[in-house]
């Protein structure tokens, strides 16, 4: 990165950025929600677009001088529509959580009932967790995974839905390695008169590449982040397969009287001015670049390799005696239950960090440990695949992780971690991140 000016003006911050660049280039990133953007994405995010206020939407701004940021936002919207095959998209949400908030605010009233996957079973904070707005403003009910299979039991989902009759059902996860039967979720939603929202923040890139099922034909709303498997800048997005009249009865005045607002109009108003003001135009520019990259044939090859790497790694972990929640993976991640190894997620995360491997501790279903300790770790392949690593590398990485975890109680574990760190550094230097230099 060209940071000469920053180095001269703010040496303290420059040093932090240089060290972080070194960490990213010389250690292995296996956090499932992280990835490396292209230099083009970073250039767009660091461009003069950051200087422009642009409240409103293209052609309907509250500020003047928006003709060029309008181009950027329209590019992002048009490319997202082509990428996912949707009629409506809003690229302004600052995050996936903001996107989820906008959807919930647009169709729910405080106290309404919602259903989502339990956080401790792989869900997300915004799907009804009691520590989040989604569990504080609304009456949240959680479905979970089966204790034996580790998979979602759709019969139990239907049973819960019929019992509580939610107004919104959310399908999506942050630590679930299987797919969602979105068609079955829609049947259940229709039975109880609920909206259906899919949160595809994690597998969005794999869906865009056509390798996992697209939920848009079956859901009222689809939300996502724009980073993770999409390899864009950190941000959020809301989509609808097709627009429809809002069923809440919200109207708008016309010259001849009034009409029902289309759901797109309700959603746009909920994003801005509902929960946000000025959009981050430099990030939206970066989203446009990333969506353009994802439309190229090479992105499908990348996404396919992400899945292959995860499958190879999961197979090796199973061979080494690890329990993978749900029995395997069909996407980019896996959740390792470490209870049989007598190691906590916290200990594993810290040891692997010292060995140059970054993962995150993660609760497993029916965990008896706190979220600050946990019984598992979450492992993902998006970032390592961006570096060009393949199945053979995935097997090696699983072996190195096993070497660290099985040595947790040994007196020479620190020496072993230093040795593994050197192997990891060599692996990373053989597979550099394109364009990243300290």
From Swiss-Prot:
Protein name: Serine hydroxymethyltransferase
InterPro entries from the UniProt entry: PyrdxlP-dep_Trfase, PyrdxlP-dep_Trfase_major, PyrdxlP-dep_Trfase_small, Ser_HO-MeTrfase, Ser_HO-MeTrfase-like, Ser_HO-MeTrfase_PLP_BS, SHMT-like_dom
The EC number(s) this enzyme carries: 2.1.2.1
Species in which this protein is naturally found: Pelodictyon phaeoclathratiforme (strain DSM 5477 / BU-1)
Database matches in CDD domains: SHMT
Gene3D superfamilies from the UniProt entry: Aspartate Aminotransferase, domain 1, Type I PLP-dependent aspartate aminotransferase-like (Major domain)
Keyword check for Transferase: yes
Chain positions recorded as (6S)-5,6,7,8-tetrahydrofolate binding sites: 119, 123-125, 370-372
One annotated GO biological process: glycine biosynthetic process from serine
Catalysis performed (reactions): (6R)-5,10-methylene-5,6,7,8-tetrahydrofolate + glycine + H2O = (6S)-5,6,7,8-tetrahydrofolate + L-serine
Cofactor: pyridoxal 5'-phosphate
GO CC annotation, single: cytosol
Positions where N6-(pyridoxal phosphate)lysine occurs in the chain: 228
């Amino acid at each position: 990165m060209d940071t000469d000016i920053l180095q001269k003006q703010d040496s303290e911050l420059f040093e932090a950025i240089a060290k972080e660049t070194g960490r990213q280039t010389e250690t292995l990133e296996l956090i499932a929600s992280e990835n490396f953007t292209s230099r083009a994405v970073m250039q767009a995010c660091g461009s003069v677009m950051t200087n422009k206020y642009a409240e409103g939407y293209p052609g309907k701004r509250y500020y003047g001088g928006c003709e060029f940021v309008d181009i950027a936002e329209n590019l992002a919207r048009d490319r997202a529509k082509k990428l996912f095959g949707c009629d409506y998209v809003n690229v302004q949400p600052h995050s996936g959580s903001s996107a989820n908030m906008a959807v919930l605010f647009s169709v729910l009233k405080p106290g309404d009932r919602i259903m989502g996957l339990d956080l401790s079973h792989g869900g997300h904070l915004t799907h009804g967790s009691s520590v989040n707005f989604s569990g504080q403003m609304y009456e949240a009910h959680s479905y979970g995974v089966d204790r034996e299979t580790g998979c979602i039991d759709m019969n139990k989902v239907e049973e819960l839905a019929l019992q509580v009759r939610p107004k919104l059902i959310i399908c999506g996860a942050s630590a679930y390695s299987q797919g969602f039967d979105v068609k079955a979720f829609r049947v259940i939603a229709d039975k109880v008169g609920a909206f259906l929202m899919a949160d595809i923040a994690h597998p969005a890139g794999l869906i865009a590449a056509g390798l996992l099922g697209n939920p848009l034909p079956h859901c009222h709303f689809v939300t996502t982040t724009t980073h993770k498997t999409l390899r864009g800048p950190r941000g959020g997005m809301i989509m609808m397969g097709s627009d429809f009249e809002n069923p809440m009865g919200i109207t708008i005045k016309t010259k001849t009287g009034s009409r029902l607002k289309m759901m797109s109009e309700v959603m746009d108003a909920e994003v801005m001015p509902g929960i946000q003001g000025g959009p981050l135009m430099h990030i939206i520019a970066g989203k446009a670049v990333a969506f353009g990259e994802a439309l190229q044939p090479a992105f499908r090859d990348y996404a396919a390799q992400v899945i292959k790497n995860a499958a190879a790694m999961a197979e090796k972990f199973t061979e080494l005696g690890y329990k993978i929640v749900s029995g395997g993976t069909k996407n980019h991640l896996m959740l390792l239950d470490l209870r049989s190894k007598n190691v906590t997620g916290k200990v594993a995360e810290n040891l692997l960090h010292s060995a140059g491997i970054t993962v995150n501790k993660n609760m497993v279903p029916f965990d008896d440990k706190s979220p600050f300790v946990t019984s598992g770790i979450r492992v993902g392949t998006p970032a390592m695949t961006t570096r060009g690593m393949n199945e053979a590398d995935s097997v090696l990485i699983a072996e190195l992780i096993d070497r660290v975890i099985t040595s947790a109680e040994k007196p020479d574990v620190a020496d072993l971690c230093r040795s593994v760190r050197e192997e990891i550094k060599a692996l990373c230097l053989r597979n550099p991140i394109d364009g990243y230099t300290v």
